[in-house]
């Protein structure tokens, strides 16, 4: 049974007919695919450590702590910011890709979300059609296939790396601005 939770994160072994699963099962699989593999591996997704840091930071915020801690070690704010940035960029890329794929291919929302999430995570899973066709993305138009390839590239290289490659670099100033108070919530 543990294999079923590892497959969406890294393996790419399509051991089940994904089109035959229930909607809640598909959403659990999509969540596992979004998180993806652990760092150092060849799988895509936002990575397990990024997800862990994000959850720990949210928990620390709820508890009123200044910094998240785990195993009697604090996690620096720079790491927390990177984890949130990676998660946000991946979520934004996933939603943009799903919307564009919906417009190009005209498939159902669930199938499109599943295919784009699978591409981002490089999991290799597909809802396909029951029967002889196993890959729904294999039936996409050339534009849809190109979008899947771009998502696979973003998922494998990493959302932050892709964002840094396109962002304008500027020299860091040695001064610090005074802290501003912003009302949240």
Language-model segments: residues:
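Membrane-proximal intracellular helices of multi-pass ion channels
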Residues: 1-185
């Amino acid at each position: 049974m543990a294999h079923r939770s590892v497959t969406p994160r890294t393996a790419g072994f399509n051991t089940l007919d994904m089109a035959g699963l229930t909607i809640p099962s598909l959403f659990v699989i999509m969540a596992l695919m979004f998180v993806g593999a652990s760092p150092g591996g060849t799988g895509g997704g936002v990575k397990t450590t990024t997800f862990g840091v994000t959850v720990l930071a949210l928990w620390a915020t709820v508890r009123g702590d200044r910094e998240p801690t785990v195993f009697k070690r604090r996690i620096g704010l720079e790491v927390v910011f990177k984890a949130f940035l990676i998660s946000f960029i991946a979520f934004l890329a996933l939603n943009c890709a799903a919307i564009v794929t919906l417009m190009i291919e005209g498939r159902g929302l669930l199938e499109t979300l599943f295919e784009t999430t699978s591409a981002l995570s490089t999991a290799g899973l597909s809802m396909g059609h029951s029967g002889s066709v196993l890959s729904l993305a294999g039936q996409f138009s050339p534009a849809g296939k190109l979008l899947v390839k771009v998502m696979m590239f973003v998922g494998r290289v990493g959302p932050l790396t892709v964002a840094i490659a396109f962002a304008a670099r500027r020299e860091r100033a040695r001064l610090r601005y005074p802290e501003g108070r912003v009302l949240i919530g």
